[in-house]
Amino acid sequence: MTAQQASDPTSFFPQRHRVHARGWINDPNGIHKNGDTWHVYFQWNPHSARHDRIHWGHVVSKDLVHWEERPAAIIPREGEADSAGCWSGVGLVDRGPGAAEGGTPTLVYSGVEEANPQFASAIVARGNSNESLFDHFTVAAPAPDIEGHGPSTFRVGKLSSR
């Protein structure tokens, strides 16, 4: 072991299986390609090693081998439908009517409220072209009451385009 390796705890992290140097990390979400860049988002709590107030971490790659860490893409927003966490979801580049030239990066995820943590709403986050900023959020569907299941079983699962 070199002195540099000893001083950098991330030097032994796997290179092809993404891990994070800090906090709780969970399943990948919103994996998609925008232009020549792959975007992988993942459930992450950067403040603790506990599964709590989940953010969406973000890494990018041109070749799916070498990865670059980006700032968190989605974070819980106080007083909003995702104030207790940003859970599972999907990602895509919207090229439909009204989208920006080249498409609008869009993430759709389950948001959980502090006041009702057992209920999840479908939230749409739209971003800028390089996906470094998601700043337009819309609650697309409030927590549904699915007969026989209740609103606590809802999760955003799949989107398709025509």
Can you say where each PLM-predicted feature lies in the sequence?
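Beta-rich carbohydrate-recognition and catalytic domains
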Residues: 1-162
